[in-house]
Every structure is written in C-alpha cells, then in structure tokens.
Amino acid sequence: MLFDRYVKNSIKGGTRDKRKEKKSTGIRRNVDNRDQRIGNWERFIILEDNKASLAHFLSTKISESYSAPPGRELVINGGFKETLKMWSSDTSRQDVRELASDHEEADTRIVLHARDTAARGYKQVNILCRDTDVLVLLLAHREHLCQEIWMFAGTSRQRRYIPVHRIPLSEEKRKSLLAFHAITGCDMTSQFYGVGKVLAWKVFEDAPDLFEHLGEESQISADVLAKAEAFVCKLYNPGTQEVEINKERAAAFRKSKKDLDAQPPTQDALILHIKWANYQTMVWNKALEPCPSLPKPEDS
C-alpha cells in the first residue's frame, strides 16, 4: 500500500492548488477512528490535510492489526506522518529499511517497490493502478524490474490487464519516454491545446533524439532547450524545419486568426513549460533512489 505525501511549495502542490480553484470549498476533518462519519466526500477529499490524515489513519490501523497469510507480505509506505517511516508484515526482513523513502508521489514509490520485488528474485510483479504516469514510469524503468510486469487498470466492472513487458519500445525511445510524456502533458504539466498524445507520438517517433539529455540536470542547457523547442514546432507543423517557436507562431497566425487558443505558445511561455517538464523528468529519472537529491523547483 503506497500513498502520496503532501508537500507544500512543490510542483505537485501547485497542481493541486490549481485544481482546487475549480471546486467547492473543502471541509477540514481529522480522521481518528473507524466509526467517524466523513460527510460530504468531495469536500473532504479536496483538502491535502484531510487526505494526509486519512492515509495516516489507514496506515496505522492496518499495520497494527494486519496478519499476513503464509508466504505473503504487506508493505505500507508514504502514509505515516513520519516521512521515512514504513512498515512490513515480514518482521524477518533485514533489508526493509532500504525502502524507506521521501518520494512525494506514490507513482515513483511504486517503481521503487517494483524494483525491490525484482531484487528479491521474483519474476513477475502485478501493479494495481489506473494512472498513465505510472505506466510510462514502468516502461521507462522496466530494465530494472521483473521479467513480467502486469498493470491492472480499468474498473471493477471492466478490468484491463496491461502486459507492460510486451509493449515494443526501442532503447532510444525508452530513454526519452519520460521527457516526451512530461513535455506533452501529464499530471504535473499542461497539454498543448489541440495536440493529443497520438499526434505527439508520431512526431516523437521521427525525432526521439530531440529529448536527449532533458531531465538530466536541474539547470537546463541552451542546447537541450533548443531541441525541445524544435520538437514543439513540429507538434504544430509536423513537416516544418523551423526551430523557433515565435516564427512558427507567426506563420500559424497568418494562416488562421480564428482560434487563438490553437496557436503555438510564445517562446517565453514555452521556455517555462520546458523547464517545468525538465524538473518533472528529473524527478521521474530518480524513481529508483529512496531519497533522491532534488533542488527546489524555484531554483531550477
């Protein structure tokens, strides 16, 4: 059982704040007993403090009462108030502390635990999750995971089983996959208006090298920035040789002045977007590290 952590002044926190602007006001509730009535669930779950309280309650109560069947192990991570606290039902494990992590997202923590499964000799790992970001993370890091990686998505009525290990992906594309996903839109970054993943993937297939080195360093170099800008130019005009987004924007505006939202972004706006995507890619690249060294978002 893996939970998100709720860190203030983070990229994830900023994303949650934007989502809250479109919703009703939350109601603060501290969850401290199993008979407690939550009331309006939507107004409860909108507040980070409520979600953190619920995660801590579940983590504490389950760890106190759970009795694992023979041959099974339950690990709980991310839900306790203490950042590095985690719990395993297998009291004989000597290496369990290696899973103590300070990841903000459960997405990356899933990959960390999946790698632990492979390190312990298991050949197959099953992951219950409906998040596209997790699927992309598993693909990007699958060389460090089990031989078989199954992701259980869908709903209880319509289940979907994704064999991650069978998805064809060249090594060049695998190395740039996280950067591609961050640039074209994920939970943390916005999507370019009118540019879906299918179109973006077609452009990516022809030029995966344009994301080389994105997410490797917190301070993005001029060369990496220029390659990412050239990729975005191709998103709006796949056949273009233009590498400057302002020129591509001007050309698109001359062709059609009706839908301004569908025009390419300005270079200033795009640079901020690329820097944001670079930081998120760096976080994902470090998913296998329990306590990765990351700069503050405002310093990147």
How would you describe each model-predicted region?
Residues 1-300:
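Noncatalytic, typically N-terminal accessory segments of nucleic acid-processing enzymes
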